[in-house]
């Protein structure tokens, strides 16, 4: 039979209210001896709180919803893992939703999470989600007093809680590295044109180019962050005869490298390549890709901190946190000045 608070109270010879307060961290007014006795009994009797009953009293379910655009993308899989880890440390449950980069599915999942009375929702937007759709979803969430935070993929709004990487700096660092190695004829394989993070990476890359008078105008190819697109675009990119390629994410770089090797080209002897994300599986061993490191663990932690702040400060101004990336120099780039 499942142990209840009543069972613990009987054995501790105290009231149910006392047991409840101690187990919820509010028993400071009771003696340390009694507190220890109650906690020990709860552990020995394998007591598990009734979360439904707790939520009815506290109006909290201790549940967070996470809506991601594509969990098959390893970057988002790693992000989900880090957020789950943070939730576990905070004793929060996590509900994971995969929108498949579909704004309608994204909205449906948000509606479902609202219906499940989650305490907060973290969203990495689908590629084609508009400002209007995002604000509509935020309003529905706000009406139910649910915390809402955008992560990674953003929209240019000062009304939304959001946590992101400084993608303009990331684009700048990647390009600056290639320029410092003596490369002057560059190609960029970008992300989807509609995504703000791809636009910011391009802006940063172009800023670095503008600081180098001897640099040629870069060749810009539109990608979609998939390895398939990187593979598909490789021949077209090579025809422009760059000495180096900046792929706007690691998956695109991975697809590029596979095709380039099939074409008999060597990395970095024939072409230098820089990626973006620093996905562990793609950046060790044979590949050893120079890339922009996104601190996913910090991104996840800040997103949860933002939700926790919003739980207690519903009417405060929007929280917007920007985390700086860094470059990881490995073996996929060559110095042309040696």
Residue positions per predicted region:
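Alpha-helical recognition/docking segments in bacterial nutrient-uptake
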Residues: 59-176, 180, 235-240
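Flexible loop/turn connectors
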Residues: 4, 233-338
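Hinge/beta->alpha junction and helix N-cap segments in small-molecule ligand-binding domains
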Residues: 69-78, 97-105, 127-131, 153, ...
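Short acidic capping loops at alpha-helix termini that bridge into adjacent secondary structure
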Residues: 184-185, 216-218, 266-272
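N-terminal helix-turn-helix DNA-binding module of bacterial transcription factors
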Residues: 1-61
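Helix C-cap/helix->beta junction micro-motif
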Residues: 45, 90, 144-145, 212, ...
């Amino acid at each position: 039979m499942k142990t209840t608070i009543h069972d613990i109270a009987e054995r501790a010879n105290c009231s149910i209210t006392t047991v409840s307060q101690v187990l919820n961290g509010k028993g400071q007014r009771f003696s340390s001896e009694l507190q220890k006795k109650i906690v020990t009994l709860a552990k020995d009797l394998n007591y598990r709180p009734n979360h439904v009953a707790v939520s009815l009293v506290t109006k909290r379910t201790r549940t967070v919803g996470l809506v991601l655009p594509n969990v098959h993308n390893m970057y988002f899989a790693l992000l989900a893992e880090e957020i789950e880890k943070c939730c576990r440390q905070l004793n929060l449950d996590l509900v994971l939703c995969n929108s498949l980069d579909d704004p309608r599915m994204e909205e449906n999942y948000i509606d479902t999470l609202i219906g499940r009375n989650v305490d907060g929702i973290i969203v990495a937007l689908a590629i084609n989600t508009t400002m209007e759709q995002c604000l509509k979803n935020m309003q529905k969430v706000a009406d139910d007093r649910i915390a809402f935070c955008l992560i990674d993929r953003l929209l240019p709004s000062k009304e939304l809680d959001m946590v992101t990487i400084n993608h303009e700096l990331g684009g700048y660092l990647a390009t600056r590295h290639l320029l410092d190695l003596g490369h002057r004829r560059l190609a960029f394989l970008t992300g989807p044109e509609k995504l703000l993070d791809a636009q910011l990476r391009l802006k940063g890359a172009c800023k670095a180019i503008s600081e180098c008078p001897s640099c040629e105008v870069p060749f810009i190819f539109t990608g979609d962050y998939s390895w398939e697109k990187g593979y598909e675009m490789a021949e077209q990119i090579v025809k422009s005869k760059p000495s180096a390629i900046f792929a706007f994410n690691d998956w695109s770089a991975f697809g590029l490298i596979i095709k380039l090797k099939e074409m008999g080209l060597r990395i970095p002897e024939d072409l230098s390549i820089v990626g973006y994300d620093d996905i562990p599986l793609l950046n060790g061993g044979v590949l050893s890709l120079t890339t922009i490191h996104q601190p996913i663990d910090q991104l996840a932690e800040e997103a949860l901190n933002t939700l926790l702040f919003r739980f207690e400060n519903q009417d405060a101004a929007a929280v917007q946190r920007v985390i700086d990336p860094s470059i990881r120099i490995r073996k996929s780039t060559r110095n042309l000045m040696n």
